[in-house]
């Protein structure tokens, strides 16, 4: 029994259920038409009315051609997930109950970014998704 005051505090965690791991779901997401580029990421997302445990799920992809070593690919993925974890409140506050957004971030650059650069890009991405989401809701 959590007091109401704690419901408005964003959770700064990124659980397993908030990550997209299913190959089938990622393939469905890649077939989605909703995408844009916010350098250094290409963003593909899908809004669905299937209720889930969390309002948003995320996956990060880094190409093997850009970074040969898995250590470097994992570093970029870790930075992107951390930036999402800290800023997901931007997205969570706007999503209606019963809706979910699946997000795939595809890294485009050839260099390992700093956390500040990654966080700035992820914030801009989340704000753009919120803007597109709210305009889509207003059209319905």
Task: Provide a role label for each language-model segment.
Residues 1-140:
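Positively charged, solvent-exposed patches that mediate nucleic-acid binding
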């Amino acid at each position: 029994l959590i007091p109401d005051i704690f419901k408005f505090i964003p959770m700064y965690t990124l659980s397993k259920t908030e990550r997209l791991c299913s190959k089938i779901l990622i393939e469905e997401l890649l077939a989605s038409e909703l995408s844009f580029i916010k350098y250094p990421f290409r963003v593909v997302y899908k809004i669905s009315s299937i209720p889930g445990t969390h309002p948003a799920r995320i996956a990060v992809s880094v190409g093997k051609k850009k970074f040969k070593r898995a250590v470097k690919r994992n570093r970029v993925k870790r930075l992107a997930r951390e930036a999402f974890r800290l800023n997901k409140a931007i997205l969570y506050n706007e999503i209606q109950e019963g809706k979910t957004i699946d997000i795939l971030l595809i890294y485009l650059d050839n260099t390992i970014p700093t956390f500040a650069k990654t966080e700035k890009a992820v914030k801009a991405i989340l704000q753009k998704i919120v803007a597109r989401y709210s305009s889509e809701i207003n059209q319905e």
